[in-house]
Amino acid sequence: MLKEFKEFALRGNLIDLAIGFIIGAAFSGLVQSVVNDIIMPIVGRITGGVDFSNLYWQLSGAPQPTLALARQAGATIAYGNFITLLINFLIVAFVLFLAVKALNKVTPKPDPASTQPPKQEVLLEQIRDLLARK
């Protein structure tokens, strides 16, 4: 059983998946830093110094100066955090789109004329055609 697990774990696809997962986690941290440390301060500057991390609607109690205090006081809707995460998602989606597009350009497309069906399939089609004529 241990041998079977070792063969399963060392198969190419599983290793590729693990490497992709680790790279994805590192990429997520990088994108989060770009959004939080570069893009959101620029957006905040353009919007008159608005700190998106503290944008919220207080649903209960008196207004509070920070999101953390507002959450302690009662229900809140932190729409500023949502805006930040939405920008984060859009950047990740756009980068993945560009990566897939580049990969599709580099990957050779199979020539439809050179791909022939297996012999068994050809024989079965011939048998089907003969039976259909009878």
From Swiss-Prot:
Compartments in which it is found: Cell inner membrane
Transmembrane annotation, as ranges: 15-35, 80-100
Pfam families: MscL (PF01741)
UniProt entry keywords in alphabetical sequence: Cell inner membrane, Cell membrane, Ion channel, Ion transport, Membrane, Transmembrane, Transmembrane helix, Transport
UniProt key word ATP-binding: no
Molecular functions (GO terms): mechanosensitive monoatomic ion channel activity
InterPro entries in alphabetical order: MS_channel (IPR001185), MSC/AndL (IPR037673), MscL_channel (IPR036019)
Domain of life: Bacteria
Topology in membrane: Multi-pass membrane protein
UniProt keyword annotation of Transport present: yes
Disulfide bonds: none
GO CC, any one term: plasma membrane
Subunit structure of this chain's protein: Homopentamer.
Protein function: Channel that opens in response to stretch forces in the membrane lipid bilayer. May participate in the regulation of osmotic pressure changes within the cell.
PANTHER family: LARGE-CONDUCTANCE MECHANOSENSITIVE CHANNEL (PTHR30266:SF2), MECHANOSENSITIVE CHANNEL MSCL (PTHR30266)
UniProt family annotation: Belongs to the MscL family.
Protein name according to UniProt: Large-conductance mechanosensitive channel
Source organism per UniProt: Methylocella silvestris (strain DSM 15510 / CIP 108128 / LMG 27833 / NCIMB 13906 / BL2)
